[in-house]
């Protein structure tokens, strides 16, 4: 019954399989950092970003290596995080459409909330009420009681949520006051919408911005709101008066990040122009340029360990996170080093960050080579690398070499059908397998660099082999004789067969490889590490998630059928031979040209010779005593095969001929002729 239910479930949705080629421990942010949270009690900084990983860092400057741990469960960009319960719990929002609840001290995911139907872009937190709100591109806002979320278990896994409706466009920013009495959302609608989270009642809509509202802040009692927009302005709103009471034109481009001191007197702003300003809200003409980053600013986090704040952490579209000192900033008025005309360039307060959390490189360019197995990539440091998709690993770092030259250098006149797709969104290689083309690529074991125990050269399906390797640890895929009768049979056949057979028998992928089952629209159904599929819980979830097209290969061992290619075989015009009846032939698309040459020699040329000569005295037909190898040698000596008047390499296969030489619609046509002696 369970299996029947699983197949029905799989039938209702198209499930893809993805995996990430990466190191076991990814110590450094590999892409832009979208969110920051500081835990001053433990001197820890949490970063969350576009590589899908949340990392914990020590902000103790005496520590040589600040990295503490990674929190991994998301499969797409992490867009926002909030620390709750005095730093014990972390809530995260992601483009994988989930909100996750983490034990922040121990670094593990406690539960996953799947209420959103699209990217979750923003979170808001009411500290006094332990209330969190989440919002995103599905235009929905959901309210979560943190104490309820942290009490969820495998058996007690139902949670009730309130929702705030009324947004007409995708939500990009969210704010809630500490008391949990006001919530504000910002969206591409260019307005601020305001609710009372206690009653879910809509209170007002505030107009004034002319572009997306990317950042929002509320004061403690919820009477004032600050907003930053892609229109380049910061606005201060009075919720009591339901209007904008001040507009700050500080930046040259969009404002994407805001922070404010506890007294709500100074706003810190950053955005597309890479500059970070501090502006006195009471005197809009007075502002100081704190620093200039090397990339657009995505998020900032004030160090609130003292008042005024001694420093600010800044995250950008690059992977490095910087801490900038704010010491002396509130004396800028006296020194006169401030900007009251944003058209005049001013000197930044800081030219170097006080502390740096170094980031790693992000892959920004890739090229799939002709063998449809290897990939060349280029990263943000201009380093080129060579990867093996089949074995899910990096083969070689090539350094700062010319990317296009490396592609040309590795070009082979070979055609293998596409059987996977590549995504670079996280800055790492994510490979996706889809039922529609996963099994399109067959190669010979020899061409793939694999040897068979019996010395044969079997045909291997790349997608099938990879799926078997990804699920190698899942007990359901193991060939394991369970009952006594089977054991007796295998005992007769020898000890070898009595062993559990795992994987594909040719190669393994790194056990730490993340494997993701997701709907073909982006929603993740299940993520696990390759090595964990033997666990009881993981195995049960795989039973519910793995689609039938993967079961067929990994569990039932039903390999797909070979791809056939139709073609016509005719004598070349120069041979003077009579054109044959145009029979449409069909063969495996991996069939080598030499095999067609053998067919021509044995079935056409030899038969012609036989009809023109008398039978020998012992009535033996020509070629009967020739071995297969001799026929192959003779065929290559005597026969030429051509396509589009180009003589073909005997090692080329039919699909390569069709792709590189035929290059036309309709069925492939090959011509043969005898070599001139």
From Swiss-Prot:
One of the protein's GO biological processes: seminiferous tubule development
A Pfam match: DUF3337
Modified residues (Phosphothreonine): 613
Gene3D superfamilies listed in its UniProt record: YVTN repeat-like/Quinoprotein amine dehydrogenase (2.130.10.10)
Renumbered ranges of WD repeats: 28-67, 73-112, 115-154, 166-205, 208-247, 250-289, 292-334, 358-397
Origin superkingdom: Eukaryota
GO cellular component: cytoplasm; cytosol; intracellular membrane-bounded organelle; late endosome; lysosome; nucleoplasm; nucleus
InterPro entries: G-protein_beta_WD-40_rep, WD40/YVTN_repeat-like_dom_sf, WD40_repeat_CS, WD40_repeat_dom_sf, WD40_rpt, WDR48, WDR48/Bun107
Record keyword DNA-binding present: yes
Tissue: Ubiquitous.
Effect of residue 318 to A: In UAF1(11A); impaired DNA-binding. In UAF1(11A); does not affect ability to promote USP1-mediated deubiquitination of FANCD2 and stimulate RAD51-mediated homologous recombination, because of DNA-binding mediated by RAD51AP1
Effect of residue 161 to A: In UAF1(11A); impaired DNA-binding. In UAF1(11A); does not affect ability to promote USP1-mediated deubiquitination of FANCD2 and stimulate RAD51-mediated homologous recombination, because of DNA-binding mediated by RAD51AP1
PROSITE patterns recorded: WD_REPEATS_1, WD_REPEATS_2, WD_REPEATS_REGION
Keyword annotations from UniProtKB, A to Z: Acetylation, Cytoplasm, DNA damage, DNA repair, DNA-binding, Endosome, Host-virus interaction, Lysosome, Nucleus, Phosphoprotein, Repeat, Ubl conjugation pathway, WD repeat
Presence of keyword Transmembrane helix: no
Biased composition annotated in UniProt, kind: Low complexity: 609-620
Location within or outside the cell: Nucleus; Cytoplasm; Lysosome; Late endosome
Residue list for modification N6-acetyllysine: 214, 578
Effect of residue 77 to A: Impaired binding to USP12
Disordered, as annotated region: 607-628
Summary of subunit composition and partner proteins: Interacts with USP46. Interacts with USP1. Interacts with USP12. Component of the USP12-WDR20-WDR48 deubiquitinating complex. Component of the USP12-DMWD-WDR48 deubiquitinating complex. Interacts with PHLPP1. Interacts with RAD51AP1; the interaction is direct and promotes formation of a trimeric complex with RAD51 via RAD51AP1. Interacts with ATAD5; the interaction regulates USP1-mediated PCNA deubiquitination. Interacts with RAD51; the interaction is enhanced under replication stress. (Microbial infection) Interacts with papillomavirus HPV11 E1 protein.
Domain comment quoted from the record: N-terminal WD region interacts with TIP and C-terminal region mediates lysosomal localization. The WD repeats are required for the interaction with deubiquitinating enzymes USP1, USP12 and USP46.
Task of the protein: Regulator of deubiquitinating complexes, which acts as a strong activator of USP1, USP12 and USP46. Enhances the USP1-mediated deubiquitination of FANCD2; USP1 being almost inactive by itself. Activates deubiquitination by increasing the catalytic turnover without increasing the affinity of deubiquitinating enzymes for the substrate. Also activates deubiquitinating activity of complexes containing USP12. In complex with USP12, acts as a potential tumor suppressor by positively regulating PHLPP1 stability. (Microbial infection) In case of infection by Herpesvirus saimiri, may play a role in vesicular transport or membrane fusion events necessary for transport to lysosomes. Induces lysosomal vesicle formation via interaction with Herpesvirus saimiri tyrosine kinase-interacting protein (TIP). Subsequently, TIP recruits tyrosine-protein kinase LCK, resulting in down-regulation of T-cell antigen receptor TCR. May play a role in generation of enlarged endosomal vesicles via interaction with TIP.
Family statement drawn from the similarity comment of this UniProt entry: Belongs to the WD repeat WDR48 family.
Protein name: WD repeat-containing protein 48
Species for this entry: Homo sapiens
Organism placement in taxonomy: Eukaryota, Metazoa, Chordata, Craniata, Vertebrata
Gene name of the encoded protein: WDR48
């Amino acid at each position: 019954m369970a299996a029947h239910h699983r197949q029905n479930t799989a039938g209702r949705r198209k499930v893809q399989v993805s995996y990430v080629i990466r190191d076991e421990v990814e110590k450094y942010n590999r892409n832009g950092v979208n969110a920051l949270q500081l835990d001053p009690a433990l001197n820890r900084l949490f970063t969350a970003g576009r590589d899908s990983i949340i990392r914990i860092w020590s902000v103790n400057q005496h520590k040589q290596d600040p990295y503490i741990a990674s929190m991994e469960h998301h499969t797409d960009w992490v867009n926002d995080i909030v620390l709750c319960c005095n730093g014990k719990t972390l809530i995260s929002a992601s483009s994988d459409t989930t909100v996750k609840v983490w034990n922040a001290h121990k670094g593990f995911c406690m539960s996953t909330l799947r209420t959103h139907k699209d990217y979750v872009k923003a979170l808001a937190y009411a500290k006094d009420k332990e209330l969190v709100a989440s919002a995103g591109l599905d235009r929905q806002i959901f309210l979560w009681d943190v104490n309820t979320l942290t009490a969820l278990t495998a058996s007690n896994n139902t949670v009730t949520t309130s929702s705030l409706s009324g947004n007409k466009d995708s939500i990009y920013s969210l704010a809630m006051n500490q008391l949990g009495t006001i919530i504000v959302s910002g969206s591409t609608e260019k307005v601020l919408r305001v609710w009372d989270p206690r009653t879910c009642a809509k209170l007002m809509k505030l107009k004034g911005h002319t572009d997306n509202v990317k950042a929002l802040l509320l004061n403690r009692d919820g009477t004032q709101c600050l907003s930053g927009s892609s229109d380049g302005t910061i606005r201060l709103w009075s919720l009591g008066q339901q209007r904008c009471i001040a507009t700050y034109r500080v930046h040259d481009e969009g404002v994407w990040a805001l922070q404010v001191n506890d007294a709500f007197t100074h706003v810190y702003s950053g955005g597309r122009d890479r500059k970070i300003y501090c502006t006195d809200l009471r005197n809009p003409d007075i502002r100081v340029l704190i620093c200039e980053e090397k990339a657009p600013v995505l998020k900032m986090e004030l160090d609130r360990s003292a008042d005024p704040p001694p420093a600010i952490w800044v995250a950008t579209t690059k992977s490095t996170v910087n801490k900038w000192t704010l010491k002396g900033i509130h004396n800028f008025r006296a020194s006169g080093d401030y900007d009251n005309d944003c058209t005049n360039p001013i000197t930044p307060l800081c030219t170097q960050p006080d502390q740096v959390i170094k980031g790693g490189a992000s892959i920004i360019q890739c090229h799939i080579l002709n063998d449809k197995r290897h990939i060349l990539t280029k990263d943000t440091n201009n380093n080129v690398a060579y990867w093996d998709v089949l074995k899910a690993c990096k083969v070689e770092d090539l350094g700062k070499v010319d990317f296009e030259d490396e592609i040309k250098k590795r070009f082979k006149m070979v055609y293998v059908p596409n059987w996977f797709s590549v995504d670079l969104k996280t800055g790492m290689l994510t490979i996706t397998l889809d039922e529609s083309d996963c099994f399109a690529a067959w190669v010979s074991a020899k061409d793939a660099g694999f040897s068979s125990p019996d010395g044969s050269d079997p045909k291997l399906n790349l997608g099938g082999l990879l799926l078997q390797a990804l699920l190698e640890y899942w007990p359901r895929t193991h060939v394991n004789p369970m009952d006594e009768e089977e054991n007796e049979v295998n005992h007769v056949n020898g000890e070898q067969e009595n062993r559990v057979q795992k994987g594909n028998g040719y190669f393994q992928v790194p056990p730490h490889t993340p494997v993701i089952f997701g709907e073909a629209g982006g929603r993740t159904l299940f993520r696990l590490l390759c090595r964990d599929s033997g666990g009881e819980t993981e195995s049960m979830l795989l039973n519910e998630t793995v689609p039938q097209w993967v079961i067929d290969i990994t569990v039932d061992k039903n390999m797909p059928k070979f791809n056939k290619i139709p073609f016509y075989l005719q004598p070349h015009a120069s041979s003077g031979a009579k054109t044959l009846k145009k029979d449409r032939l069909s063969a495996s698309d991996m069939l080598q040209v030499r095999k067609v040459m053998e067919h021509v020699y044995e079935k056409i040329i030899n038969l012609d010779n036989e009809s023109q000569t008398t039978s020998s005295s012992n009535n033996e037909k020509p070629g009967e005593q020739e071995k297969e190898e001799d026929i192959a040698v003779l065929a290559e000596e005597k026969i030429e095969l051509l396509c589009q008047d180009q003589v073909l390499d005997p090692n080329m296969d039919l699909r390569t001929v069709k792709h590189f030489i035929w290059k036309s619609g309709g069925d492939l046509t090959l011509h043969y002729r005898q070599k001139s002696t």
